[in-house]
Curated annotation (Swiss-Prot):
Name of the protein in its database record: Probable inorganic carbon transporter subunit DabA
Lineage of source species: Bacteria, Pseudomonadati, Pseudomonadota, Gammaproteobacteria, Pseudomonadales
Entry membrane topology: Peripheral membrane protein
Chief location: membrane
Named cofactor requirement(s): Zn(2+)
Keyword Transport: yes
Subcellular location: Cell inner membrane
Quaternary structure and interacting proteins, as annotated: Forms a complex with DabB.
A GO-annotated cellular component: plasma membrane
Superkingdom in the source lineage: Bacteria
Nucleus is among the record's keywords: no
Pfam families in the cross-refs: DabA (PF10070)
Coiled-coil boundaries: none
Organism of origin: Marinobacter nauticus (strain ATCC 700491 / DSM 11845 / VT8)
Length: 801
């Protein structure tokens, strides 16, 4: 083999580090039942977005931009207008020449990678390279290894990591070849070091090669990265696991070395001369620069209107306190909440709505009665701290209920074992088939009514040692929530905490419609935990000592907003005192009216125009339980902006359900502590959501989940494959962003507006590496409000927009 690379330090130490460096470029994914939106380019955030796009184009033939025809259509249709193109060219430091830019749109867009691995190289006499065969072998090995639920015939043995499992299964065929046998070491670190010495890649090139190879099974690479990510956060589901992505990379490297070994000397020389130095990126071509100008003009077409609206909004001065509202309702920052908040304020002027991250600052796992696993209900960026365990009020009652549920589950498990057993699979159908007939008919006729998730009372404990929370800890949680949404005074008689969720049937992607801040779960549980804390007398006494006085006349209630039907379910209605019944009854009436207005507003996008209010609600209810419904709602499609500031900035605006809204009062945060939290957590989560939708539209073949109609679930809840494919699909199904004729999401980077002094925002950028990377490398656009002006952060300075 030509030109093996010599590494200066011990390979056993350096190579695994390089392998892990490559794995850091892969974004993680979560299981279907805990699915959350992820920025597919998160691992590349430290590079400028334009350069990363060029690198990905070189590695995969998959840059970030839409094809030229997309921008041409936007120009011809008037969505992009000349002022937008002029501004985009000016930002790029180029002279506006619309005719030249139009001509460059006609240039052919290359989707061919510049680098081709030895596995992807077609040798003389071959019809195709060995890549596809290897891809299928590794993909099926991953499916067998990670399939812990559906594959009930798997023979249990000694615990193996992924590399060892592959070695004992698929690796045996390679082991028969003497030239490769020396590479097959018993552990992945040693194997990676051995293989890397045999490859002609430098220490700079090796991580790029690994990234390229992992991209051929991006779904499984992302899954392995997710397992590593969750294990690092202490997830009990992933305990005892580590470096799965690195193990997968090592398997790929072994196959790459094998492909090189099989080449003739002439073939190796030809391949190396052509591809090994293909990692040196050429400067951006004129066509590429033009395409970025067109994309920026496409963004400016919406952002300019958005910023104009912010500047001209009818807002009161922060120096003028809002009159005390009759009700305060805190919603998740999710873009779908913008619609219900706007409609609720329209029908109920006495209400004040607020926006806050939908897990309500409760970093919890939820433990239900019976033999169930804990459910994480917090953002994927965080590790759970507390467990919320349901209780009937006494340990004896809890144990009795657990025993009953355990018995039921044992019966169900017996049926499942018979159903999946290799001996009884067919006889079970013959003997019990008729017993399932009524359920089949009932479900086919949509007779099951979808209901909001039941939320039972519970107690908070520490995840690690199981001890109850101390009073100061409970006060900390409550204070953190109230300060996060700048609600520290002027409390209304009713404080409603509204989580949100979606209720669908036969939908593996259901978690993608639920609350991302709650780990792909519905938000009612978190709302209930927060409301219980805020109603606790000892917690209120502790808050008062810290300067937050909640009057005795204020009650906190929890609720959940179904984003498909726009109905809001309030929990604990029977606990509302007589003194609050008038306000409560008014609230219930106004919530129903606001939901009705929301349904009318959404009818056009759902193709349900012309229906009466009753028929519209009935149709949306049907969607929650229809087996065949592929578009129960549009989720967060078309998200484009975020506002971190007082509601007065946006209360007079119709933002079309396109903006994340988080309340923030800069006058209550002189230290900038709250702003740091909001820009480093909710803003990053919004970026993850925004760029997942972006990727699912820009490159649905790579960063999307394909056609829902062809999905097959892998491993019970690992993910989905499309048709007979071998790779997990990441991102969003086509039906979530495309209506059959038009894209329902416009691929734009998030435009964030923050109402805070420049020095406070800049301090957050300096102090947080992730925020700095996203802002300075243009993965999002950051603006601030100053009087009646908006200014954009641009290379360390603020530019008037």
């Amino acid at each position: 083999m030509n030109a093996p690379v010599t590494y200066s330090a011990s390979c056993e130490q350096v190579i695994p580090e390089l392998v892990n460096e490559a794995c850091e470029r892969i974004a993680p994914i979560w299981p279907l039942d805990r699915w959350i939106a992820v920025n597919p380019w998160w691992g590349s955030r430290t590079g400028p977005v334009e350069k990363v796009s060029r690198e990905l184009d070189n590695l995969f033939g998959a840059g970030l931009l839409m094809p030229p025809a997309f921008y041409r259509e936007a120009w011809d249709g008037g969505r992009i207008q000349r002022p937008h193109l002029e501004e985009a060219a000016r930002e790029a430091g180029l002279k506006d020449d619309s005719q030249a830019l139009l001509a460059q749109l006609s240039g052919a867009a290359s989707n061919q990678p510049g680098f081709v691995s030895a596995l992807g190289y077609t040798r003389r006499g071959q019809q195709e390279p060995p890549l596809e065969e290897v891809r299928e072998e590794i993909g099926r090995a991953c499916a067998r290894y990670f399939d812990l639920r559906q594959n009930r015939w798997r023979v249990s043995g000694t615990k193996q990591d992924l590399y060892q499992f592959w070695l004992s299964q698929s690796g045996r065929s390679l082991a028969r070849k003497a030239s490769v046998e020396m590479l097959l070491k018993p552990d992945w670190q040693e194997a990676a070091a051995t293989v890397a010495r045999e490859l002609p890649y430098s220490s700079r090139q090796l991580p790029l090669v690994i990234h390229h190879l992992l991209g051929h099974l991006l779904g499984w690479a992302s899954w392995c990265r997710g397992v590593d990510w969750r294990a690092a956060l202490g997830d009990p589901h992933e305990s005892g696991t580590e470096h799965f992505c690195a193990q997968l990379a090592t398997i790929w490297l072994i196959h790459e070395a094998h492909a090189l070994i099989n080449m003739t000397e002439a073939e190796r020389e030809s391949w190396q001369n052509r591809y090994v130095n293909a990692f040196d990126l050429a400067p951006a071509s004129a066509n590429e620069q033009a395409l970025w100008i067109w994309h920026r003009a496409y963004e400016l077409a919406w952002q300019s209107r958005f910023l104009d609206d912010i500047r001209s909004s009818e807002r009161s001065s922060l120096a003028e306190p809002d009159p005390v509202a009759e009700v305060q309702a805190a919603f998740c920052i999710d873009v779908r909440s913008e619609v219900i908040r706007r409609q609720l304020e329209k029908v109920y002027p006495e209400i004040r709505t607020l926006g806050v991250a939908g897990f309500f600052g409760m970093p919890i796992v939820h433990h239900r009665h019976g033999p169930t696993d804990d459910e994480a209900r917090l953002p994927g960026l965080l590790a759970p701290v507390y467990r919320y365990s349901e209780t009937l009020g006494s340990p004896s009652e809890d144990r009795e209920l657990d025993r009953k549920l355990d018995s039921r589950e044992q019966v169900r498990e017996s049926v499942r074992r018979a159903k999946y057993s290799s001996l009884s699979t067919f006889t079970l159908v013959e003997t019990t088939g008729l017993a399932w007939a009524w359920k089949l008919v009932r479900d086919s006729l949509n007779r099951n009514s979808a209901k909001a998730e039941a939320v039972e009372p519970g107690r908070l404990h520490h995840c690690v040692d199981g001890y109850p929370l101390s009073d100061p800890e409970r006060v900390n949680l409550a204070e953190g929530l109230l300060r996060a949404m700048s609600l520290t005074k002027g409390f209304a008689s009713v404080l409603l905490l509204v989580g949100h969720g979606a209720h669908t049937d036969n939908n593996p992607n259901e978690a993608g419609l639920a609350c991302g801040a709650c780990g792909g779960k519905n938000g009612g549980v978190n709302a209930r935990v927060a409301a219980e804390l805020l109603n606790d007398r000892q917690v209120r006494a502790g808050l008062a000592e810290r300067g937050i006085v909640m009057p005795e006349s204020t009650i906190a209630l929890a609720a959940e907003h179904c984003t498909i039907t726009d109905r809001i379910t309030i929990y604990g209605r029977d606990q509302v005192p007589d003194s609050h019944q008038r306000v409560f009854n008014t609230l219930v009436e106004k919530l129903e009216a606001a939901g009705q207005a929301c349904r009318r507003e959404r009818a056009t996008s759902l193709g349900l125009n012309g229906k009466t209010d009753d028929d519209l609600l009935a149709e949306l209810k049907r969607r929650t339980r229809n087996w065949a419904e592929v578009r129960p709602e549009w989720g967060l499609a078309n998200n484009a902006g975020m506002v971190i500031g007082p509601r007065s900035l946006t209360r007079s605006l119709d933002l079309g359900g396109r903006c994340f809204l988080h309340d923030y009062d800069p006058s209550q945060d002189p230290s900038g502590e709250v702003l740091t939290l909001l820009m480093s957590a909710p803003m990053v989560v919004a970026n993850w959501i925004n760029l997942q939708y972006f990727g699912s539209v820009a490159r649905p073949d790579i960063f999307g989940a394909g056609n829902k109609l062809l999905h097959s679930v892998v491993g019970g809840n690992l993910g989905v494959v499309e048709g007979n494919g071998v790779d997990l699909k990441i991102g969003l199904p086509l039906q979530s962003v495309f209506d059959g004729e038009h894209w329902r999401h416009e691929p734009m980077r998030l435009a964030v507006v923050v109402d805070a002094p420049a020095e406070r925002i800049e301090a957050v950028i300096r102090g947080n590496a992730d925020v700095r990377a996203l802002v300075e490398n243009r993965w999002l656009w950051l603006h601030r409000v100053e009087g009646d002006q908006t200014l954009r952060y641009d290379d360390g300075r603020w530019v008037t927009t």
